[in-house]
Design a protein with these regions (language model features):
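Active-site cofactor/substrate anionic-group-binding motifs, chiefly glycine-
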Residues: 57-111
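Secondary-shell segments that build the walls of catalytic and ion/ligand-binding clefts
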Residues: 208-276, 283
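A generic, well-ordered mixed alpha/beta core segment in the N-terminal half of proteins
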Residues: 87-180, 186-192
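N-terminal glycine-rich anion-binding loops that anchor highly charged ligand groups
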Residues: 13-21, 34-60, 74-85, 288-291
Length: 376
C-alpha cells in the first residue's frame, strides 16, 4: 500500500495527464536510441506505476536511466532471448537492457506455462532495473492466474541485522491473486523498511522520512531526507549506514526482513545466474552492466480447484477483512491493492501529480535530448 501524495494543487506541484506522462517517457527513450518495441513496453510499465501512486518507480527513474546509458552500461538495442527452457521453466538473458521488456517477456512465458502445466516459472539474468514488481504480478491476476515476482537489485543499500555496512538491496516481492467480485489482492513490497527510491521521493518533496527507514554508521535513526540520500547514494559504503531490513531493528524482528531479502536474492539472483552486488562491484567498471536477476511464477488455480472456487473463496476472505471493525472510526481496514486501485482511477481522471523539482529535472533531460517538454 503506497503512501498518499499531497493534493496536486498544493504549492510546488504540477499535474500532468497520464497520456502526457506516457508520451514524455516514450519520447525520451526513443531519443536516447531505444528500439520502438522496447521503449513502448518500458513507457507503458512506467506510466502505470505512476498511475498506481508508486511515484518512486515511474517517470522519476528517467534521471537514473540517463546516467546508466551515459556510462555505457545500458544496452539500448537489447534483444532478450531464451537460453534454456522446459515445459514448466525458462531462463531469459535480458541482453543488458532495461528490465521492463525482459520482465514482461518473462511473466508472459510463465503465464503460458501456467495455463498449460498448472504452474510456470521463469528467471531472467543480465537485466537492469525493471520498475515496480507489482506490475508483473498483476499481469497474471488480470488473466485469472496467481502471479509472483521477485528481483535482485543493483544498489547496495540495506544493512543486515547486527551489521554496520550495507550488503543487500531492497529485494522486492510482489504477489497478486484474482478474485471474482473484488479487485485482485496485490502485495508489492520491499524487504527493506522502505525502498531507496521512496527516500528520493521524500527528498524531492522536501519532507523528512519516517524514523526507522535509514540508520547511520552508528545505527542511529536518520530522518533528514537529504542526509539519508547522502548515506544511500553519495558516500562510500564502507563508512556504514543504510536502509534497515523490514522490521527496522533487531528488537522489532528485522531478522525477518533480512531473511526475506536473502530468499529473494536466492530465487531471483542466484537461481538465474545473476550477480550479487557486493561481489560484482569489486571488479565492475562504470560501463559494465548491472546483471540483475528476476523471478516470475504463474499458477493456475484451476489446477487445484474447480473453476471459480478459488476466486469465490478469496472474495470471502477479502470481504471478511473489509468488514473487520476498525480501531479508529473513519480508517477502515484495507486490503493490499486497495490504495493503488483507488489512486489509479483517480489519476486516470484527474492526472498525475508531480513535484516541480522533478518536472525541472525532466525538462533538463528533454532539453539535452532535443525533445519537447510535455508536462507543463
Amino acid at each position: 500500500m503506497s503512501a498518499r501524495v499531497p493534493p496536486s494543487d498544493a504549492p510546488g506541484w504540477i499535474t500532468a495527464s497520464a497520456e502526457n506522462v506516457h508520451q514524455q517517457i516514450l519520447s525520451l527513450l526513443l531519443a536516447w536510441g531505444m528500439s520502438g518495441e522496447q521503449a513502448r513496453t518500458s513507457a507503458a510499465v512506467m506510466v502505470d506505476t505512476d498511475l498506481s501512486g508508486v511515484d518512486s518507480h515511474g517517470i522519476s527513474m528517467l534521471m537514473d536511466y540517463d546516467q546508466s546509458r551515459r556510462k555505457g552500461k545500458l544496452n539500448l538495442h537489447a534483444k532478450p532471448r531464451v537460453l534454456r527452457e522446459t515445459a514448466v521453466t525458462a531462463l531469459i538473458d535480458a541482453d543488458a537492457g532495461l528490465g521492463h521488456a525482459a520482465a514482461v517477456m518473462g511473466m508472459r512465458m510463465a503465464m503460458e506455462r501456467g495455463r498449460r502445466q498448472g504452474v510456470g516459472i521463469v528467471t531472467v539474468r543480465n537485466s537492469h532495473h525493471f520498475g515496480a514488481a507489482g506490475y508483473y504480478s498483476r499481469m497474471a491476476s488480470a488473466e485469472g492466474l496467481l502471479g509472483l515476482c521477485l528481483s535482485s537489485t543493483r544498489t547496495i543499500n540495506t544493512v543486515p541485522t547486527r551489521g554496520r555496512v550495507p550488503v543487500l538491496g531492497t529485494n522486492p516481492i510482489a504477489f497478486s491473486a484474482p478474485a471474482r467480485r473484488n479487485p485482485p489482492f496485490t502485495l508489492d513490497m520491499a524487504t527493506s523498511s522502505a525502498a531507496s527510491n521512496k527516500v528520493k521521493v521524500y527528498e524531492l518533496r522536501g519532507h523528512d522520512i519516517p524514523g526507522g527507514w535509514v540508520v547511520d554508521e552508528q545505527g542511529e535513526q536518520v530522518t533528514n531526507a537529504a542526509r539519508a540520500m547522502e548515506i544511500l547514494f553519495q558516500r562510500p559504503k564502507d563508512i556504514g549506514g543504510g536502509l534497515t531490513p523490514l522490521g527496522a531493528s533487531a528488537e522489532m524482528s528485522s531478522h525477518k526482513g533480512y531473511g526475506l531479502a536473502m530468499m529473494v536474492h536466492i530465487l531471483a539472483g542466484t537461481l538465474s545466474g545473476s550477480s550479487f552486488s557486493p561481489v560484482r562491484v569489486r571488479t565492475q567498471r562504470p560501463q559494465d552492466p548491472d546483471n540483475l536477476g528476476h523471478f516470475f511464477c504463474a499458477i493456475d488455480p484451476a489446477a487445484f480447484r474447480a473453476p471459480g472456487e478459488f476466486e469465490d473463496d478469496l472474495d470471502t476472505v477479502i470481504d471478511t477483512l473489509r468488514t473487520t471493525p476498525p480501531a479508529r472510526p473513519g480508517e477502515p481496514v484495507l486490503v493490499h491493492g486497495d490504495i493503488e486501485t483507488e489512486t489509479r482511477e483517480r489519476r486516470k481522471a484527474k492526472g498525475i501529480p508531480l513535484p516541480e523539482t522533478l518536472a525541472r529535472k525532466i525538462r533538463a533531460l528533454c532539453d539535452d535530448a532535443n525533445v519537447p517538454f510535455l508536462l507543463a
